[in-house]
């Protein structure tokens, strides 16, 4: 057997071992009497996340039926556990005079700082221009750390509308900002199903779609199509996804579904550190260009969006000079290929 065959067999064995381990953890988590924070719950989810974070060649979309069923069940369990965890810490924070002074009590707060830095860096690079004035976050939950970090560290002049289907989650979230004059003035919490939000979407410069809003691929595709119908042309969409084994924790979003929803996909970024979510930056397509009277082709037809999308991995936050040079080189290569 050649070297290539040995490597292939090793990869298959590693993937099978990983799926087997995650299947066992999913079974153990499914047998827990409660997903509220406890030593047992925390230990199992810590082991699960630790198993899924390292770079992996596993393709969750290519799993067999049993593994796919396990994965779908596990993502729902992760969503429930995340909701319990956020509600628990939201209540703890609300007991303080100014909850926003104590956000570091949340054990994964640093992950949100890094994810928000990454998302803002990608937005600034791929959607240049004035800073967003109005931002919507869809699926903000009882502990809206993403909005809070973005507002405090990256978008100090923007207003944020946070949408969640749960009125209880929004009540918890609103308690956190009441004592802070700045956040209280810029943060609004709206209880609604995303599919029912229509005309309001026209007013946002950026819309963030949380990873767990639309957990099934078909549901996510419908939501993206809904956003494509109602967002303003030129507005940015930030979609959280997952890659590799991290797809056992969160849904994987196909960039092609975002294109079909009426968006130009600008970049896809897969972190390889403790930031679990991949990030897709897209922009609502402008209205079709006018058709010249004496020709059968549109005037100033833009190049198809799918030709120039860059899929990138760290540098985190896209802030370092090396990352910037590499990204520019990717763009130059893409343009050369399109012109060839």
UniProtKB/Swiss-Prot annotation:
Give the UniProt record's GO annotations in the biological process aspect.
Answer: nicotianamine biosynthetic process
Say if the entry is tagged with keyword Cytoplasm.
Answer: no
User: In the UniProt record, does the keyword Lyase occur?
Assistant: no
Q: What turns on expression?
A: Fivefold increase after iron deficiency.
Which reaction equation describes what this protein catalyses? 3 S-adenosyl-L-methionine = nicotianamine + 3 S-methyl-5'-thioadenosine + 3 H(+)
- The membrane-spanning stretches of this chain are none
* Subunit annotation: Homotrimer.
Protein name (Swiss-Prot/TrEMBL): Nicotianamine synthase 9
């Amino acid at each position: 057997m050649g070297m290539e065959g040995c490597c292939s067999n090793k990869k298959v064995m590693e993937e099978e071992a990983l799926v087997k381990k995650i299947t066992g953890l999913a079974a153990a988590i499914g047998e827990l009497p409660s997903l509220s924070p406890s030593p047992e719950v925390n230990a199992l989810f810590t082991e699960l996340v630790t198993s899924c974070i390292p770079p992996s060649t596993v393709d969750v979309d290519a799993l067999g039926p049993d593994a796919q069923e396990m994965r779908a069940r596990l993502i729902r369990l992760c969503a429930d556990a995340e909701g319990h965890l956020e509600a628990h810490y939201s209540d703890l924070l609300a007991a303080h005079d100014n909850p926003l002074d104590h956000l570091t009590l949340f054990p994964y707060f640093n992950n949100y700082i890094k994810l928000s830095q990454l998302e803002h860096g990608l937005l600034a690079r791929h959607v240049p221009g004035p800073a967003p004035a109005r931002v919507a976050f869809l699926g903000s939950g009882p502990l809206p750390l993403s909005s809070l970090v973005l507002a405090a560290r990256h978008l100090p002049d923007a207003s944020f509308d946070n949408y969640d289907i749960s009125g209880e989650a929004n009540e918890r979230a609103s308690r956190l900002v009441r004592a802070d004059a700045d956040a209280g003035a810029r943060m609004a919490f709206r209880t609604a199903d995303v599919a029912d939000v229509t005309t309001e979407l026209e007013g946002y410069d950026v819309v963030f779609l949380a990873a767990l809003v639309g957990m099934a691929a078909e549901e996510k595709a419908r939501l993206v199509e809904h956003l494509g119908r109602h967002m303003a042309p030129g507005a940015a969409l930030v979609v959280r996804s997952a890659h590799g084994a991290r797809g056992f924790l969160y849904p994987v979003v196909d960039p092609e579904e975002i294109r079909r929803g009426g968006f130009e996909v600008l970049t896809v970024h897969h972190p390889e550190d403790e930031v679990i979510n991949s990030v897709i930056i897209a922009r609502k397509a402008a209205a079709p260009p006018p058709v010249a009277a004496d020709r059968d082709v549109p005037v100033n037809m833009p190049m198809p969006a799918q030709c120039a999308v860059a899929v990138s991995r760290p540098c985190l936050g896209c802030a370092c000079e090396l990352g910037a040079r590499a990204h520019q080189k990717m763009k130059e290569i893409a343009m050369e290929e399109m012109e060839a």
